[in-house]
């Protein structure tokens, strides 16, 4: 049986009160519509068609080649939205999954179970349902005495008895594809909203003698639709818990999983420990046996094995095996910390390579530089890389020693085994084995204290 997917993503989302198209709001680092399409892709459909509206260009840019697109000119309801997919799917044999783009919590497993149930029962239509603790706002599933689905009643159209029902429509359906598009021809907008409801297809099919069923999924939380910022936060919290639990099942320890925010695409190796109040975002990869302490923030970076990150920020950078950083240090984009290197406290590294076993202990800025191996960078060293117009590069060779308080003014080359005396301002290249001293000589003036204004305070 061929499988198809229609994703409804044309809604404006006015309740979000945002310039951003609703389905493009992110949950754990991925847009809602990406979550939906990725979950649907797991059922291996022949085609995914996304229905877009006013934000079509933005949605198409995000999904790219994951989907085909059809345009709904006016938002006239879910039935009208699905009908726009007829140009792509109308003549296909198979089963079609219909899902909204603002439900990021659905899983591939749930979609697979729905397809399986739909096929085994030989249904023309199957609605995915759930038992809601508070069903207000949801469409209710109305069944006959034998438990067969009669229809779905929307909140604004239901009578008091119907609104007592707690089994709700999740907004996900599986249809016989050809029967779906044939039934859509008979849907009208005779309802409180004046819209064409996709749910009316169920009653049309049933009245035609077709089998209409419902598969009740066990986890109601998957069905959460995001219509405002409150629901967005709720979805993020649920997704965060799901992501963290998956990492824990794979051998990662979380000291306080409720306060560790990990994006959906992050990869973490086993025996790594994540403390509370940690943020790891984007396409970050973290190896095995690492320790990430509270207050750390890692974005789009690659962390090797046995790395310790202590209350530091790492952005679009790489730390190789057996390195450490922090506390309170910052790797800005394009920093590379090679094996065994040490980045101490209050160090900023930007667009620089720190060689193997090199130590940058504290209170240092390293920008636009290449440092070799086994170098010691003293406290308070500044790599001065900017003249107000252009940025320049500094090279420091293997086994060099940079004394505390030094400033290296680029462009400059410090050779292997060179020695920079403390508090020097270096403006010229330093050759191999040489020591550079560039500071004013100390002058002691005997008995000068008594000439200072301070001495008068002693009288």
Swiss-Prot record:
UniProt cross-references to Gene3D superfamilies, sorted A to Z: Hexapeptide repeat proteins, Spore Coat Polysaccharide Biosynthesis Protein SpsA, Chain A
Xref: InterPro entries: Bifunctional_GlmU, GlmU-like, GlmU_C_LbH, Hexapep, Hexapep_transf_CS, NTP_transferase_dom, Nucleotide-diphossugar_trans, Trimer_LpxA-like_sf
Binding site for Mg(2+): 102, 227
Named cofactor requirement(s): Mg(2+)
GO biological-process terms attached to the record: cell morphogenesis; cell wall organization; lipid A biosynthetic process; peptidoglycan biosynthetic process; regulation of cell shape; UDP-N-acetylglucosamine biosynthetic process
CDD domains hit by this protein: GT2_GlmU_N_bac, LbH_GlmU_C
Compartments, record wording: Cytoplasm
Location of region: Linker: 230-250
Pathway the protein takes part in: Nucleotide-sugar biosynthesis; UDP-N-acetyl-alpha-D-glucosamine biosynthesis; N-acetyl-alpha-D-glucosamine 1-phosphate from alpha-D-glucosamine 6-phosphate (route II): step 2/2; Nucleotide-sugar biosynthesis; UDP-N-acetyl-alpha-D-glucosamine biosynthesis; UDP-N-acetyl-alpha-D-glucosamine from N-acetyl-alpha-D-glucosamine 1-phosphate: step 1/1; Bacterial outer membrane biogenesis; LPS lipid A biosynthesis
One CC-aspect GO term: cytoplasm
NCBIfam families, alphabetized: glmU (TIGR01173), PRK14354.1 (NF010934)
Protein name: Bifunctional protein GlmU
């Amino acid at each position: 049986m061929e499988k198809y997917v229609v994703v409804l993503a044309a809604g404006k989302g006015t309740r979000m009160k945002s310039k951003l198209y609703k389905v493009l709001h992110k949950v754990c680092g991925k847009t809602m519509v990406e979550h939906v399409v990725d979950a649907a892709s797991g059922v291996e459909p022949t085609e995914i068609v996304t229905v877009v509206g006013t934000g079509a260009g933005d949605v198409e840019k995000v999904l790219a080649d994951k989907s085909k697109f059809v345009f709904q000119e006016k938002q006239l309801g879910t039935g009208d939205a699905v009908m726009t997919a007829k140009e792509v799917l109308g003549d296909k044999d198979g089963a079609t999954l219909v899902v909204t783009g603002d439900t990021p919590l659905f899983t591939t497993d749930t979609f697979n179970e729905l397809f399986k149930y739909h096929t085994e029962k030989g249904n023309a239509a199957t609605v995915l349902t759930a038992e809601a603790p508070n069903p207000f706002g949801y469409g209710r599933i109305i069944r006959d005495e034998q438990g067969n689905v009669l229809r779905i009643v929307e909140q604004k159209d239901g009578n008091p008895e119907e609104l007592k029902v707690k089994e709700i429509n999740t907004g996900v359906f599986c249809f016989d594809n050809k029967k779906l598009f044939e039934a859509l021809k008979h849907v009208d907008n005779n309802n409180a909203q004046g819209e064409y409801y996709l749910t009316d297809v169920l009653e049309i099919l049933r009245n035609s003698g077709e089998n209409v069923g419902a598969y009740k999924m066990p986890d109601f939380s998957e069905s959460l639709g995001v219509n405002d910022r409150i629901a967005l936060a709720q979805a993020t919290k649920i997704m965060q818990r799901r992501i963290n639990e998956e990492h824990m099942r794979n051998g990662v320890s979380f000291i306080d999983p409720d306060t560790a925010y990990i994006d959906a695409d992050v990869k973490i190796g086993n025996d790594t420990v994540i403390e509370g109040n940690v943020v790891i975002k984007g396409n970050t990869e973290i190896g095995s046996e690492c320790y990430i302490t509270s207050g750390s923030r890692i974005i789009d970076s690659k962390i090797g094995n046995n790395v310790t990150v202590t209350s530091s920020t790492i952005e679009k950078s790489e730390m190789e095996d057996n390195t450490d950083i922090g506390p309170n240090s910052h790797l800005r984009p394009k920093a590379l910390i090679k094996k065994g290197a040490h980045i101490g406290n209050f160090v900023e590294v930007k667009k620089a390579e720190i060689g193997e076993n090199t130590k940058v202990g504290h209170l240092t800025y390293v920008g636009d530089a290449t440092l070799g191996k086994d170098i010691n960078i003293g406290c308070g060293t500044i790599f001065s890389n900017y003249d107000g117009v252009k940025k320049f590069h500094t090279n420091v060779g293997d086994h060099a020693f940079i004394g505390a308080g030094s400033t290296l003014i680029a462009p400059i080359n410090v050779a292997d085994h060179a020695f920079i005396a403390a508090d020097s301002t270096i403006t010229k290249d330093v050759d191999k084995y040489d020591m550079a001293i560039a500071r004013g000589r100390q002058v002691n003036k005997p008995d000068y204290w008594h000439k200072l204004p301070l001495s008068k305070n002693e009288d």
